[in-house]
Amino acid sequence: MLFPLFLELEGRPCLVVGGGPVALRKAKALEDCGARVTVVAPEVCGRGFADADVEGMTLVLAATNDRALNRRVADLCRARGIPVNAVDDPANCTFVFPAVLRKGPMTVAVSSGGACPVAAKMVRDKVGRLMADDFVSEVGRLGREREQLKRDFPDPQARKRVCEEALRKWND
């Protein structure tokens, strides 16, 4: 079973093995989070994968059209305790890329654990339609006022009630 987790990747080294559309899309997603991404693929850097490429990486994505190579990358990473995702091969993944929605301060991630990524995208899109712009704005306001709310309502339960009341109209 996978544990849902949001991970800080700012400045962290990440490796993408493969140069096709899926690999490059996931490399961009990692870069968008501030990761230092290295892409290894003949069509990108003029050489193929070498075992040493995984050394020192925070996480690795194997996204080639060669399942044996993806499996080799996954095995190397597992042996070194490096989180790895082998695209379209859940058995060789220690993490998955969820379907992600970002609106203001809100981030929603939905995963089927690799069973059916299309279903995860459908749920993400449905949730996106439910998150009205004014709801997202109110969440942003509460976030900006969080320190003041902590001072005004030192009891966590009281603070929770204030936030719930501010957001109640979107939950009815």
Regions found by a protein language model. Give the residues of each.
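Hydrophobic, well-ordered beta-alpha structural blocks that scaffold small-molecule cofactor pockets
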Residues: M1-E43
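Residue-level detector of alpha-helix initiation sites
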Residues: P21-V22, A68, G114
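Glycine-rich, highly charged phosphate/nucleotide-binding loops
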Residues: V40-E55
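Short, ordered loop/turn segments at secondary-structure junctions
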Residues: P42, D88-N92, G113-G114
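Short basic, glycine-rich beta-strand/loop surfaces that mediate nucleic-acid
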Residues: T58-T64, F95-A115
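ADP-ribose/adenylate-binding Rossmann-like module
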Residues: L59-T64, N70-F97
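An accessory alpha-helical subdomain
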Residues: G114-D172
